[in-house]
Amino acid sequence: INLDPIQSVPLPNWSLKYTGLSSLKAFKNVFNRFSIAHAYRASYTLTNFQTNLDFDPQNPFQRDEAGNVIPERLYSNINLVEQFNPLVRLDVEFKNSLKILAELKRDRALSLSLDNSLLTESSGNEYVIGMGYRIKDLRIRTNLNGRRTTLSGDLNLKADMSYRRNITVLRNLEYNNNQVTAGQTLLSIKFTADYNLSRNLTTLFFYDHNFSKFEVSTAFPQTSIRSGFTLRYNFGN
C-alpha cells in the first residue's frame, strides 16, 4: 500500500452517456429521445509541504521525544474533492412533446489540516426532477386598437423542482470529537411559460420559489419568491 500523499498517477475522471435504447423499435414508437448519463469528477491537491530537517535517511524509523516517527516531509493541508455530477440522469422526450428529466447528484469535499489534526468534511445530495411540454401553433384572439387579430405561436411550458441537502462536519482527530459547523437544506421550485407573439417578439412568465433551512441554530430559515413577465424582442432576422 502506497502511503505517499504525493500521487504519481492522477485520479480518473469519466463521463458516460447512453442513447442506444432510442434505436429499439419499442422505444422509437414512444420516445423522440431517451438517454441515460453518468459523470465523475475528482481533484486532489497538496497546498503546502516541505522537507523535514530532522529526518535521518540512515535511520528512517527514528522517533521524536513524544514517540512519533519523524517523517521525511512535513505536510500542512491535503484536499480531496469528488463530484458525481450526475450520479445518474434520465432525459426523455415523448412523441407528444412531453419532456421529463430526473437527476441525482452527489458531492464530497475533504480538507485535512495536519497542523492541528482537523478534518473538515462537506457532503451534499441533490435530487432534480423537471417536466416540459410544448403546445404547437396555439391560437389566441386579441382585440388591439379595435382590430381583431389572431396570434399563432408555440407555447412552451417548463417546471423544475430540486431538493438539496449539504452538511459540513469538523472532526478533531486527536480527541475523537465531531461537530456540525455548517449546512443547509434547499428546496427550489421553478416554472416558466413562453409564447411567441410574433417572429421577433416573445413573452415569458416566470415563477421562482426558493426555501432554505440551515443546520446550525444561529441561522433562521429563508424563503424567496420571484415572479413576473418578460418581453423579449429579437432584432435579428
At which residue positions do the language-model features occur?
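Exposed, low-structure sequence patches enriched in small/polar residues
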Residues: I1-N237
